[in-house]
From Swiss-Prot:
Monomer. Interacts with NAXE and NDRG1. Residues 1-18 form the signal peptide. Belongs to the apolipoprotein A2 family. The gene is APOA2. This is Apolipoprotein A-II. The modification Pyrrolidone carboxylic acid is found at Q24.
Length: 100
């Protein structure tokens, strides 16, 4: 019986000691989390700049831009022509009643 009581007492003391140690452990504060976040973002930005300096990425961007321009130029010209036709039709409708 004494051994059982001693075991329960030892278990209680150990669990209380563990809880006390956990409370004393330093919790990360908001300032350190924000500083770590900004440091990570800065490192990511530096890596991105290093990658962007490479000629391969610049060549890909240039090819993409040229392809996009090739595809959009006819569409823009057609839209401009359609707009001019629409406005000229609208202007013709306005001038016809005035001449009658």
């Amino acid at each position: 019986m004494k051994v059982l009581a001693l075991a329960v007492l030892l278990l209680a003391v150990c669990s209380l000691e563990g809880a006390f140690v956990r409370r004393q452990a330093e919790e990360p504060n908001l300032q350190s989390l924000v500083a770590q976040y900004f440091q990570t973002m800065t490192d990511y930005g530096k890596d991105l700049v290093e990658k962007a300096k490479g000629p391969e990425l610049q060549a890909q961007a240039k090819a993409y831009f040229e392809k996009t321009q090739e595809q959009l130029t006819p569409l823009v010209k057609k839209a401009g022509t359609d707009l001019i036709n629409f406005l000229s039709n609208f202007m013709d409708l306005r001038t016809q009643p005035a001449t009658q």
